A protein has these predicted regions:
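Serine-esterase "nucleophile elbow" of acetyl-processing enzymes
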Residues: 4-85
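Alpha-helical cap/lid subdomain in secreted, periplasmic
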Residues: 51-53, 73-205
Length: 205
């Protein structure tokens, strides 16, 4: 879905269409349980999972412009039907951009994990740390504070893992590498996805 189309919809309309599209895809090709489920914002939507991880059964249920709060509110539609063995989550970037505090985002991830485990106690999760993007560089300190809190939470449960992408996405000047982003300075380029795929691969076993 194009960004322009998303912005023309209300949040309720946007989510209704996204969930209807997922339902249609599931009816056409029902995904078996035990897959690796990717959820989150446009960073997940744009990831070519079949190309990046050809040997792994993946399901992409990313939604444009979505937040971590959105994921928590829709676990029954985004997660539970798929009974995944592993969830890969990238979300929270948009929450921070909308004014949420680091503490609020970290609490949302804790809620997400506990709500999933209430129904799927064996499911593991990988939280991809919030990325340092050129467009949102002014928010990097809040992003890093969020990452620190979520990393700390992940260290207390073997079902959780935190994938830190911050340092490897910076150049010699300690600023985000432009080659890892498309022109908008927010979304990942093919080089960015290649880097992330390499970093994530060991977690998918």
């Amino acid at each position: 879905m194009a960004v322009a189309a998303v912005s023309a919809q209300t949040p309720a309309e946007h989510w209704a269409k996204a969930l209807a599209d997922f339902d249609a895809a599931d009816r056409a090709v029902p995904p078996p349980p035990g897959n690796v489920l990717f959820i989150g914002s446009s960073t997940i939507v744009n990831w070519d999972l079949a190309k990046a991880f050809p040997a792994v059964r993946t399901v992409n249920r990313g939604v444009w412009s979505s937040s971590l709060y959105d994921a928590v509110q829709r676990i029954d539609r985004l997660v539970l039907p798929y009974a995944p063995r592993l969830i890969v989550l990238y979300a929270g970037d948009n929450d921070i951009n909308s004014g949420a505090t680091s503490e609020q985002v970290a609490v949302e991830f804790e809620r997400f994990a506990f709500n999933v485990w209430a129904k799927l106690p064996q499911t593991r999760m990988v939280f991809i740390g919030l990325k340092p993007s050129p467009q949102r560089w002014a928010q990097v300190h809040r992003m890093r504070a969020t990452n620190a809190l979520i990393r700390q939470f992940c260290e207390h449960d073997d079902r959780l893992a935190f994938l830190d992408v911050d340092g490897v996405m910076l150049g010699w000047d300690e600023k985000p590498r432009r080659d890892l982003y498309v022109e908008d300075g927010l979304h990942l380029s093919s080089q960015g996805y290649q880097l992330w795929s390499t970093l994530l691969s060991p977690f998918l076993q």
